[in-house]
From Swiss-Prot:
This is Tubulin beta chain. Transmembrane segments: none annotated. It is found in: Cytoplasm, Cytoskeleton. GO terms for cellular component: cytoplasm; microtubule. Mg(2+) binds at E69. One of its GO terms (molecular function) is GTP binding. Belongs to the tubulin family. It comes from Paramecium tetraurelia. Tubulin is the major constituent of microtubules, a cylinder consisting of laterally associated linear protofilaments composed of alpha- and beta-tubulin heterodimers. Microtubules grow by the addition of GTP-tubulin dimers to the microtubule end, where a stabilizing cap forms. Below the cap, tubulin dimers are in GDP-bound state, owing to GTPase activity of alpha-tubulin.
Length: 442
């Protein structure tokens, strides 16, 4: 079947990944020992998208965990589903990348990368028909960003025709963990533009906002944030794992969402999100889901879709619902908010419906949108990058690992190009010549 190899790198990637496996295991009825305790055959029908079957009927995640220091992996191992993973698939160094992209990409990471690739190869060879790779990592640190992008380019070389999908946590505007985030993020984006097929962009601040505003949590933990991300991650692939009326997979998603090869950075959202107390006061209907899904407050990255236009979007519905109603709602959204969709791609929302809803919900929807507003996020990182780079602040940490200033300049200009490409398509109209003719006729 259509298998996916999951790779998680660095502290952030491993924490999101661990949460993701909790969510997926729950959906498929698999307990922390890998034994199946489900209630429906559908849970096992395509379980091999994410799991290998081991002896004695145990299900083992097709996951590869990598990091340059043992800390996070130890906590994953000690976590609720830690015994689920295959011990050989933990690949870690001892030194750490120290939030330094160059260490992850060129020195420390480069030493470890071959052992990671061995595990990737082993997992890929065991697949029947490999659909692609999904990677969870952050762009602000050293391992997830530096080594993560190194891995992406190596895997790309070896499997050029497989889909490479990343869930990338971008440094958020107000919350900063490390001073050199803008450097690490810019160098990473430079790689992702060239080597990844689809990047789902997430940022902590937007996730915090969702937790405060919508879920009404007073003190959200990283666990809460990661749970939001996992819900969306599980939605992106649910069509591969469960039967549905309108199926979608990673490749269909890519074909429908990417009008130009470089513009593959997506915003994701998930609905319904309600605070625990107000759940019973809401009816879940397709119109209600659609409304929340397109709400700017629902986006998991700090860019406001109302400041740009959607090139394309995809709605992945889950649950029993009428296809007709979904189609009507999608048309409705496009007609009512036509100014937020580029008019030179007609019908630019793809929808798919999967019959099995997530645990505890009657219906849900995952939203993936390709909006030109995401340039706000790149602009923000670029400004911070330029401010430091102009003074060559902190550069010695990178040049000391053998990097060249030239590489920084290239990454900076690549990111600026990306921003202006988004802007160009935001301003483009369907018939630029056509407008003048109409004026003449009046």
């Amino acid at each position: 079947m259509r298998e996916i190899v999951h790779i998680q790198g660095g502290q952030c990637g491993n924490q999101i990944g661990a949460k993701f496996w909790e969510v997926i295991s729950d959906e498929h009825g698999i307990d922390p020992t890998g034994t199946y305790h489900g209630d429906s055959d559908l849970q096992l029908e395509r379980i091999n998208v994410y799991y290998n079957e081991a002896t004695g009927g145990r299900y083992v995640p097709r996951a590869i965990l990598m990091d340059l220091e043992p800390g996070t992996m130890d906590s994953v191992r000690a976590g609720p589903f830690g015994q689920l993973f295959r011990p050989d698939n933990f690949v870690f160094g001892q030194t750490g990348a120290g939030n330094n992209w160059a260490k992850g990409h060129y020195t420390e990471g480069a030493e470890l990368i071959d052992s990671v690739l061995d595990v990737v190869r082993k997992e890929a060879e065991g697949c029947d028909c490999l659909q692609g790779f999904q990677i969870t990592h952050s762009l602000g640190g050293g391992t997830g960003s530096g080594m993560g992008t190194l891995l992406i380019s190596k895997v790309r070389e070896e499997y050029p025709d497989r889909i490479m999908e990343t869930f990338s946590v971008v440094p958020s505007p107000k919350v900063s963990d490390t001073v050199v985030e803008p450097y690490n993020a810019t160098l990473s984006v430079h790689q992702l533009v060239e080597n990844a097929d689809e990047c789902m962009v997430i940022d902590n601040e937007a996730l915090y906002d969702i937790c405060f505003r919508t879920l009404k949590l007073t003190t959200p933990t990283y666990g809460d944030l990661n749970h939001l991300v996992s819900a969306a991650m599980s939605g992106v692939t649910c069509c591969l794992r469960f039967p549905g009326q309108l199926n979608s997979d990673l490749r269909k998603l890519a074909v429908n969402l990417i009008p130009f090869p470089r513009l593959h950075f997506f915003m994701i959202g998930f609905a319904p999100l309600t605070s625990r107390g107000s759940q019973q006061y809401r009816a879940l209907t397709v119109p209600e889901l659609t409304q929340q899904m397109f709400d700017a407050k629902n986006m998991m990255c700090a860019a406001d879709p109302r400041h740009g236009r959607y090139l394309t979007a995809s709605a992945l519905f889950r649950g029993r619902m009428s296809t007709k109603e979904v189609d009507e709602q999608m048309l409705n959204v496009q007609n009512k908010n036509s100014s937020y969709f580029v008019e030179w791609i007609p019908n630019n929302i793809k929808s798919s419906i999967c019959d099995i809803p997530p645990k505890g919900l009657k219906m849900a929807v995952t939203f993936v949108g390709n909006s030109t507003a995401i340039q706000e996020m790149f602009k923000r990182v670029a400004e911070q990058f330029t401010a430091m780079f102009r003074r060559k602040a902190f550069l010695h940490w990178y040049t000391g690992e053998g990097m060249d200033e030239m590489e920084f300049t290239e990454a900076e200009s690549n990111m600026n190009d990306l921003v202006s490409e988004y802007q160009q398509y935001q301003d483009a109209t369907a018939e630029e010549e056509g407008e003048f003719e109409e004026e003449g006729e009046q």
